[in-house]
UniProtKB/Swiss-Prot annotation:
UniProt catalytic activity: L-threonylcarbamoyladenylate + adenosine(37) in tRNA = N(6)-L-threonylcarbamoyladenosine(37) in tRNA + AMP + H(+)
UniProt protein name: tRNA N6-adenosine threonylcarbamoyltransferase
The keyword tRNA processing appears for this protein: yes
Family label: Belongs to the KAE1 / TsaD family.
CDD domains reported in the protein's UniProt record: ASKHA_NBD_TsaD_bac
GO-annotated molecular function: iron ion binding; N(6)-L-threonylcarbamoyladenine synthase activity
Binding-site residues, substrate: 133-137, 166, 179, 276
Described purpose of this protein according to its UniProt entry: Required for the formation of a threonylcarbamoyl group on adenosine at position 37 (t(6)A37) in tRNAs that read codons beginning with adenine. Is involved in the transfer of the threonylcarbamoyl moiety of threonylcarbamoyl-AMP (TC-AMP) to the N6 group of A37, together with TsaE and TsaB. TsaD likely plays a direct catalytic role in this reaction.
Intracellular or extracellular location(s): Cytoplasm
Keyword Metal-binding: yes
Organism: Wolbachia sp. subsp. Drosophila simulans (strain wRi)
Main location per the UniProt record: cytoplasm
Length: 335
């Protein structure tokens, strides 16, 4: 059995987990930074300072709760990209320092791979499988062929889907993060009232574009006085628009996989936006694949997914040198 201590500091969550190859989570400590909610978004310098302040305490707490010592660990893992460079430096340097002192291997984890693989901690999802990663920083389709081996089928050409949710929410006068509030208000709205643009729909390929939807919502806000019902109707119409785009792109992704002679049975939807229950139900109803969603606490950033990915990589003997430099941009294809 292998056991890993993992660190996640790529954005505004400071998290530490201890995970083993028997699929047990021995400890998980996470601290979300409420400061960003008051400011309407993540401030990189504030985020990195908070990581510096809290990370060592979370590591100490996780080790104590696991009833292990550093000598009991088989490796130390950290999210080393992509993400905000300040946070990545804090987490990666701390993990490398522990690895050096404890004489343990260091594993640099790609944040995107961690989102893609965490489902295998919970379910018997076999390679190859299709991944739709929809989060605050990323929106892309991947075929996961194996640990460390991916084919990117498409991605956003402008904003990520999470950014689109947050920016639309801000236009409507809602607080950050916008996704949960849009989903809540949409339940009281009429999704057929406003016809928002479905960019790139019915076109070949798996790329996305969400800038036109934002512009359309901005125009609605300027045209209407935006009563409470108007806001609910815009939220519902926005979600209907997003679901139509995702369904169209998923159909194309399946066709593209077939053209590559890759048989896909399992489809994993992951990332923070995958916690949206409306989108989950739409995809379940219309996609003829085995669909898997991580639980909500594993859709958003966490250290459990980093620890599990560390286990998967350790089992392949994928070890990284202590001079590995954090990467704010890190394509999963080249992993």
């Amino acid at each position: 059995m292998k056991t890993i201590l993992a660190v996640e500091t790529s954005c505004d969550e400071t998290a530490v987990a201890i995970v083993n190859s028997d699929k047990q989570v021995l400890a998980h400590e996470i601290l979300s930074q409420a400061e960003h909610k008051k400011r309407g978004g993540v401030i990189p310098e504030i985020a990195s300072r908070a990581h510096m302040e809290h990370l060592s305490g979370l590591i100490k707490s996780a080790v104590e709760k696991s009833n292990l010592n550093f000598c009991d660990l088989n490796a130390i893992a950290a999210t080393s990209g992509p993400g905000l460079i300040g946070g990545l430096i804090v987490g990666t340097m701390m993990a490398k320092a522990i690895a050096h002192v404890a004489q343990k291997p260091f594993i640099a984890v790609n944040h995107l791979e961690a989102h893609a693989l965490v489902i295998r901690l919970l379910h018997e999802v076999k390679f190859p499988f299709l991944v739709l990663l929809i989060s605050g920083g990323h929106c892309q389709f991947l075929i996961a062929q194996d640990v460390g081996k991916y084919i990117k089928l498409g991605e956003t050409l402008d904003d990520s889907l999470g950014e689109a949710f947050d920016k639309v929410a801000k236009m409507l006068g809602l607080s950050y993060p916008g996704g949960p509030l849009i989903e809540k208000l949409a339940k009281k709205g009429n999704g057929a009232r406003f016809k928002l643009p479905r960019a790139m729909i019915k076109r070949y390929g798996c790329n996305f574009s969400f800038s036109g939807i934002k512009t359309a919502v901005k125009n609605l806000v300027q045209e209407l006085k935006m009563s409470e019902q108007d806001v609910c109707d815009v939220c519902a119409s926005f979600q209907e628009c997003i679901s139509d785009i995702l369904l169209d792109r998923v159909s194309n992704a399946i066709i593209m996989a077939e053209s590559l002679n890759i048989k896909i049975n399992d489809f994993v939807i992951t990332g923070g936006v995958a916690a949206n229950n409306f989108l989950r139900e739409k995809l379940k109803q219309h996609i003829n694949l085995n669909i898997f969603f991580p639980p909500n606490d594993l859709c958003t950033d966490n250290a459990i997914m980093v620890g599990w990915t560390g286990i998967e990589r350790l089992q392949k003997n994928y070890i990284d040198p202590l001079n590995f430099a954090p990467r704010p941009k890190w394509e999963l294809e080249s992993y």
